[in-house]
Amino acid sequence: MNDRLGTPRREIVMLAAAFGPVCFRLMAAAQQERDPHPVNADQALRDLLAGNHRFTAGATLMPRRSPEDFRALSGGQFPEAVIVSCADSRVAPEILFDVGVGDIFVVRVAGNVIEGTGVIVKGSIEYAVAELNVPLILVLGHSGCGAVKAAKKHIDDKDSLPGAINGLVELIKPAVARSKGMSGDPLENAIRQNVETGVEKLQRMEPILAPRVKAGTLKVVGAVYDLQTGAVALNGKAK
């Protein structure tokens, strides 16, 4: 191309090669920007289930996980949901729901126990709801949960476990007992009942959660994550 007619073609190609990646990153960052105001509970739940579908389909987006994304949230956080999950190393909510930094507020405790855990778990959940205005709490159990399995064995064998483990399984035993007599796999029933017990506890928890549940501004649901398939299935009717 003649210089009098504009920038030579060779220079245009060089400029495109130099600035193309930068433009792509800026466009991607713009697409991944979050609305700082939390969505409602139904939309938050749809987002989580859609992310899990991507995870099981092998089509994860893995959004907002760069150092720049972490720095962008250094001044505040706007999670869509609280996930109360087991501490099991195979359960990683950010991965199985295909979300990025700042999307979910995760509280992890062995057996995803709510009852009897004191101010640490309760205060963490209440903080997310009261201060961060999170509209959804999801209690997430998982297949083959060792804590529930230990509680079931504790009841069946009437044995004693060492240290604080014994106290932990004592908190799960009522849910295991409630699952007795249900049709189907005894361990799976106990795991689902343990999740449901946690959901019921949170729905009644005063003074922060229960009024919001009653007013319809907070939803508490339960689900179970299948370690074999990666799928998350809601635990009965979402309330």
Show where each model-derived region lies:
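N-terminal secretory signal peptides and thylakoid transit peptides that target proteins
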Residues: 2-20
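Divalent-metal-activated hydrolytic enzyme cores
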Residues: 13-14, 32-76, 111-123, 127-135, ...
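Boundary at the C-terminal end of the N-terminal hydrophobic targeting segment
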Residues: 28-30
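Thiamine diphosphate
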Residues: 54, 78, 94, 98
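Glycine-rich, flexible N-terminal cofactor/catalytic loop recognition
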Residues: 69-81, 86-91
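Short beta-strand segments
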Residues: 84-86, 108, 138-142, 221-226
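Active-site cofactor/substrate anionic-group-binding motifs, chiefly glycine-
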Residues: 87-112
